[in-house]
Every structure is written in C-alpha cells, then in structure tokens.
A protein has these predicted regions:
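Glycine-rich anion/phosphate-binding loops
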Residues: 1
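Aromatic-rich peripheral "rim/lid" segments of glycoside hydrolase catalytic domains that contact
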Residues: 4-7, 16, 20-65, 78, ...
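Aromatic-lined carbohydrate-recognition surfaces of secreted/lumenal glycan-active proteins
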Residues: 12-19, 62-103, 168-172, 221-227
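Glycan-recognition surfaces
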Residues: 123, 129, 223-226
Length: 291
C-alpha cells in the first residue's frame, strides 16, 4: 500500500493502522493476545501431525495475532517505516461512546504500544460513533434522548482528549431504529418530522461536544459514514435506514443543518437556505428553519 501511494504521489493525512481490535465481551481484551482468539465463530487454533495448523478463525479476523503476540507495536513500527513521515498513524474502534470499559481498554493498549516502542508512535485514536436512537413524536422525550446521549459523548471526548493524542470521529452516522425482543434492529423507515428533528439535534450535539471537549490542536476531524439515505448506499449497512445528512434524492435534511449548526457554533437560521432544502421540508409541512 505504501508503495502504491508513493507511485501515485499521494501523501495520506492519516492511516488506520489497527481497526476494531478490542472485544466487546471477554472483559474488553485485545483480539489475538492473551488467548483471546478473534470474534464470534472463532475458536482456539489447533495443530497436529496429521492436519498441521488449523487456525479455526473466520476470514478477516485477527489470525496474525496468533503468530505475533506483539502485533500492535509491530504494525505501527512498519507503518511508520514505510509511510511518509507526515502521515498520522491511528488506531480505531467502535462503541467507545457507549462502553467506557472498552474505551479504557483501548487506551491502555495504546499506552502499551507506545511503551513497547520506547516512545510515542500512535498519533491518534479514532472513534467510529455509529449512533442509534429511537426518537418519537414527543419533543420532551426526544430532548431526553439527546441529553442522555450527550453525557456519554462528552465523557468519551474528554477521556480521549486526556490521552494527548489526536482525536478523530471516523464513521459518524445517526440511525433511527428500535430493537425487537430478539435484539434485532428494525429501521424507522418513514420518520416523522419530530424524529428527523431529533436526528438533527444529535448530529449538532456531536459536533458541539467535539469542539468543546477536544482541544483544537488535537482535533483531527469528523468523517461522515456514507452520504445519502439512498437504499443503494445501505444494502448491507443500516438497511432501510435514514442515517445520513442527505435524503435518497440528494436533498439536504434537517440532519445537514444540524451538522452545519454544530460546526458553526450557532443556529444558522435563514442564513442557511436553498430551494431544494426548503422544498423538501415543505412537503412534510415542516419549517425549513429549525426553531
């Protein structure tokens, strides 16, 4: 990959060296280390004279950790060796805003990688932030959803900022859904105006929290995961959902304005316009300006 980038004359800003290495169960341990063998469907590798080595791991899981127990530091050392000096090296994971124990485990592993290297080699930590909410048509209930989520998001960003590392939101989206008795996701496929408003408020809150709790020098940026609500973009991820800033027709949603307000630090109000935006919300009998 480094050779390919060099051939194209590309110097990437950042590189995700290790992705999703911390388990959700097993006490939030590092996959491939201390007998934590991958994820669901994986079992301990076996070896015998007749069959040789059988990893017993599903494709794409952390089989290489079986061979190299200190793969964390080696991965970063190789990335630092072959990538441009300007490229920032990141580690990335999910559910960090909802699981303080997983966040703590990731940070401890980052510390151990830096220590094993003899100096800081991890430049930044990425938090995916695939947020799921179940908004209603009740404004008070939706306000509580945003408020409760804000406490978790604030705490996450404060904890990440305390590491002194760069902090990046890597895969932000806000899914409107509920979960049935079997724990299966059910998308809110036709959200009401109030539900769209709640989604916008969550987007706004995330941007505001990031700017408030992460010092500017540590702000690496926020990446939105996918662009529109077009079903073609959600064939596999958040199927039937409406998680993005633009609708299926590429028109701006309230979520777009929520993100813009969060970036601007103010309600842009009528300064934010465009006939496509207004027409979309007039069809829903919703004011184009969030009151």
């Amino acid at each position: 990959m480094a050779e390919h980038l060099a051939e194209k004359g590309v110097t990437p800003y950042g590189y995700d060296v290790i992705n999703e290495a911390i388990t959700d169960g097993n006490g939030n341990k590092v996959r491939g280390v201390d007998n934590v063998f991958g994820m669901s469907g994986d079992t301990e590798p076996t070896e015998n004279e007749a069959d040789g080595l059988e990893l017993n791991w599903e494709s794409g899981h952390f089989y290489w950790g079986y061979y190299v127990k200190d793969y964390g530091v080696k991965a970063f050392q190789l990335a630092r060796k072959y990538l441009p000096a300007e490229t920032k090296l990141f580690i990335n994971d999910y559910n960090l805003e909802t699981s303080p124990s997983k966040l703590a485990a990731l940070i401890e592993w980052v510390k151990s990688i830096d220590a094993a290297n003899g100096s800081a080699i991890v430049d930044g930590i990425g938090t995916q932030m695939h947020i799921a909410i179940n908004p209603t048509d009740d404004a008070t209930s939706n306000t509580s959803i945003v408020s409760n989520l804000k406490e978790k998001v604030d705490a996450q960003f404060k904890t990440l900022a305390a590491t002194g590392k760069l902090v990046r939101v890597t895969e932000l989206d806000v899914d409107m859904c509920k979960y049935n008795a079997n724990g299966e996701r059910e998308a809110i496929s036709s959200p009401s105006a109030a539900q769209y408003k709640c989604q916008a408020d969550v987007y706004k809150m995330v941007f505001e929290s990031y700017k408030t709790n992460v010092p500017e020098a540590q702000q690496s940026g926020i990446t939105i995961w996918s662009l529109t609500d077009n079903p073609d973009e959600h064939e596999y991820w958040l199927k039937d959902g409406k998680p993005n800033l633009f609708d299926a027709d590429n028109l701006r949603k309230w979520a777009y304005k929520g993100a813009c307000d969060g970036i601007a630090g103010e309600d842009l109000g009528l300064k934010f316009g465009g006939e496509d935006y207004k027409a979309y919300y007039e069809r829903q009998n919703v004011s184009p300006t969030v009151q």
